[in-house]
Amino acid sequence: MRRWMGLFLGCATLAHGEITRHGGGDEALPDRQYVHVVSQAESPVMQTWIKAKDGVYIAAAVRKPLSSKWGNGPFPSLIMFHGAPGGRGMDQLVGWSRGDHGGPVWERFLQEGYVVVVADYRGGDWNQMNRPSSTGLVTAIDDGITVIDYVQNLPYVKRSDVSVYGVSLGGNLAMYLASRVPTLHAVVAGAPAPIWFLGVKLNPDGSRPDLAKAELDPAVVRENIAPIRMPVLILVGTEDRLMPLDIMLHDELAKQGKAVRLEIFEHGYHDFVLGNQGQERKDLPRGEILLPGALEALELTLKFVREPK
């Protein structure tokens, strides 16, 4: 705790960064009142296959906001990238898009007039797939760029108002997309695992190092952060082992003068921002629950994506 507080107090003074810590309870809220709130008859899930750079197809679940309330567009859009592993498949994406498991995020943006795209990306070898390749290998980063290009060119989407929200490993992807797609409106990294984005080396056996003592690669950090133009929002919980790394991510963005905010939520477990995703989590005694902090983070995220700053 002492080490973390030192990091917190130190980075809170950075000129271009902003860190806020949120309190709140750890009770499990009933989640069913927050899901299935948008008519699937009026806003059906469109199962979409997007051709990737190498000819394979990327699954995406797309929903448009209600025309009875929002008209026919063009609409702003939020593209959401899930956590590990890549290659979840269409059924999983559709379930998330509908809020079938209790997570409120996807439908909340739909309620506010956003085209919500829940997109997949390829899995595979961690080190090969989760950073750009210099050998021509098509990676998850290429898939993310392809999805953004597809969404930006949809006739009912406002091209200049497309944002990305990535969680966990999807947060690593989101940061690479912030670096490589300057036309994005805003980028949100929820409980991100920016291991490759920051040049952190895995252990020789492929396992994750102690992230509280992680050593970043300064050259990789500079190269990846320098091109970023849009504001970035980072969300993490105090019970998440990735918190030290996410503080480092905030610090590095702030050092390079980027517009970045870090919001830290008491009691937040890894991926708490999405609530129940329908996953078996042996690391969580109560399983995936909807925390008060998740709802606070959701409304904060919605406000940020509307007006990034």
Task: Cite the ranges covered by each PLM segment.
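Short beta-strand/loop motif that positions the catalytic acidic residue
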Residues: 228, 234-236
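C-terminal catalytic histidine-bearing segment of alpha/beta-hydrolase fold enzymes
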Residues: 259-309
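Conserved alpha/beta-hydrolase "acid-adjacent" motif
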Residues: 241-247
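Hydrolase active-site cap/lid region
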Residues: 171-217, 221, 225, 275
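N-terminal cap/lid segment of alpha/beta-hydrolase-fold proteins
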Residues: 21-73
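Short substrate-entry loop that stabilizes the transition state in hydrolases
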Residues: 69-75, 83-126, 242
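Alpha/beta-hydrolase fold nucleophile elbow
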Residues: 157-168
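Alpha/beta-hydrolase active-site loop
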Residues: 134-155
